[in-house]
Regions:
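Short, surface-exposed ligand-recognition loops at beta-strand->loop->(often short) alpha-helix junctions
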Residues: 9-21
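Short hydrophobic/aromatic beta-strand micro-patches
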Residues: 9, 41, 54-56
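Residue-level signal for well-ordered alpha-helical positions
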Residues: 21, 41, 66-69
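Active-site-flanking beta-strand signature of metal-NTP-handling nucleotidyl enzymes
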Residues: 2-8
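Short, glycine- and small/hydrophobic-rich beta-strand elements in well-ordered beta-sheets
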Residues: 26-52
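Glycine-rich beta-strand-turn "strand-cap" elements at beta-sheet edges
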Residues: 39-49, 75-104
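An amphipathic, aromatic/His-enriched active-site/gating alpha helix that lines ligand/cofactor pockets
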Residues: 28-36, 56-91
Length: 104
């Protein structure tokens, strides 16, 4: 499994619009084949907000199917990337593999 973490830093006055765009995108992401988990989280630090999107993918083919050929580029709705001060995407190999459910 692959864990993908998108971290975006926003000015506080842009955070509401960015969060709205991300919440609009989540249903699209949740229905993509191979996605096992997704969580959108934030923390407020002074005049900025940091947003993290945690994704867990069953395999690299599923991740590429969602993200496209350049995994370092985020897949965001139009207008979202222009709202950020800093944007990072990182990928990790999951080490704590969940057992498959019985009968499936």
């Amino acid at each position: 499994m692959i864990v993908r973490v998108l971290t975006a830093t926003l000015k506080a006055d842009q955070a509401g619009l960015f969060n709205e765009l991300m919440r609009t995108q989540l249903p699209l992401l949740r229905h993509h084949p191979g996605l096992r988990y997704v969580k959108l989280a934030r923390r407020i630090r002074g005049g900025e907000q940091e947003v993290c999107l945690f994704e867990e993918w069953a395999d690299t083919a599923s991740l590429y199917g969602w993200a496209g050929p350049d995994l370092e580029r985020p897949r965001l709705l139009p207008g979202a990337e222009e709202l950020v001060i800093d944007l990072r995407v990182a990928h990790y190999e999951a080490l704590d593999m969940d057992p498959e459910p019985e009968g499936g």
